[in-house]
Amino acid sequence: MKKDYYEILGLSKGASKDEIKKAYRKIAIKYHPDRNQGNEEAASIFKEATQAYEVLIDDNKKAKYDRFGHSAFEGGGFEGFSGGFSGFSDIFEDFGDIFDSFFTGNKGQERNRKHARGEDLGYNIEISLENAYFGYKNNINITRQILCHSCLGKKSEKGTSPSICNMCNGSGRVVQGGGFFRVTTTCSKCYGEGKTISNPCKSCKGKGRITNQETIQLNIPSGIDNNQQIKMKGKGNVNPDNQEYGDLYVKILIRSHKIFKRNGKDLYAMLPISFTQAALGKEVRIKTIASKEIKIQIPKGIENEEQIIVKGAGMPILQTEKFGNLILITKIKTPKNLNSNAIKLFENLSKELRDGDEIDLLKV
């Protein structure tokens, strides 16, 4: 018994054309033979979906099917269709973006591969916050694929030439299947090149490129942030087909600092101050990330975890002459291990301030 066409596409009767197209598109992408080579079950599902789509997308055929079911097409050429299967290729006109690569043997992919640059490479380097502040120069060692010095990317030994592929006769593509169900794919022997290397270059083993280890200088600019990347043009792998090199992307990882915490252009640090400094205020000296000594004023009566902003003492802003701020967060230290004189002073201060033994929690 033949399956219901709506059921094959996962639709209910009365589905719109857009719904039919979307349902077929989803199945076709998943089960197309070019993506499931050698998988007979996938080919069968794709064939069923195509038959269902061919009927349900056509208003006349759909009307007949809705009224009479499969019997409306008994005796026809395509699985019993009265109209035959004259327009198989027309089915895919609305899906050119998907099926162009399937039905042209991935010509677009072959063309892109031959004209694309070589692969990009990635490299991670860890630096200190001071390195990020001042900028940093360092040599890094990389391994990449460069053009073979012997064959210059031609892949054959000197004095020899590639041979025409005998599987695809130089087209780079082969046709699979028969009758209406034919799919063109990339030749598995020459990988779409249309030619094979009968006498491969001994230096690169017919690949057209060789592995090379080299040392290059990396210039890290002042103000760079964590996880930012530096692009080094042409320092990736080579594509031997066109001798174009990819790029190297160096990712910057900044180590945590024991004093300063970074947030973009600004730096944060704890500022430990005494009880008296907090109460009376005081001018103090501190060192910045640049090891520069500066003076700051602690305001009278400052509370714990309040901020003091030092403008221009933060990180350099990348590719500018501007700087962020240094934000100091106060941490008031409670005195411990007091001697007798200090104890008397605090007792007198407590009396002067009229510290009682009752605390109102609402006055925090």
UniProtKB/Swiss-Prot annotation:
Primary subcellular site in the record, as a coarse category: cytoplasm
Function: Participates actively in the response to hyperosmotic and heat shock by preventing the aggregation of stress-denatured proteins and by disaggregating proteins, also in an autonomous, DnaK-independent fashion. Unfolded proteins bind initially to DnaJ; upon interaction with the DnaJ-bound protein, DnaK hydrolyzes its bound ATP, resulting in the formation of a stable complex. GrpE releases ADP from DnaK; ATP binding to DnaK triggers the release of the substrate protein, thus completing the reaction cycle.
Pfam hit, one: DnaJ_C
Protein name, as recorded: Chaperone protein DnaJ
Residues that hold Zn(2+) 1 according to the record: C148, C151, C201, C204
Family matches, as CDD domains: DnaJ, DnaJ_C, DnaJ_zf
Zinc finger annotations (CR-type) as residue ranges: 135-213
Organism annotation: Borrelia garinii subsp. bavariensis (strain ATCC BAA-2496 / DSM 23469 / PBi)
Domain of life of the source: Bacteria
Keyword Chaperone in annotation: yes
Start and stop residues of the CXXCXGXG motif repeats: 148-155, 165-172, 187-194, 201-208
PROSITE patterns named in the record: DNAJ_1, DNAJ_2, ZF_CR
The UniProt record lists the keyword Zinc: yes
InterPro entries: DnaJ, DnaJ_C, DnaJ_domain, DnaJ_domain_CS, HSP40/DnaJ_pept-bd, HSP_DnaJ_Cys-rich_dom, HSP_DnaJ_Cys-rich_dom_sf, J_dom_sf
Cofactor, how bound (note): Binds 2 Zn(2+) ions per monomer.
Family: Belongs to the DnaJ family.
The gene coding this protein: dnaJ
Cofactor requirements of the protein: Zn(2+)
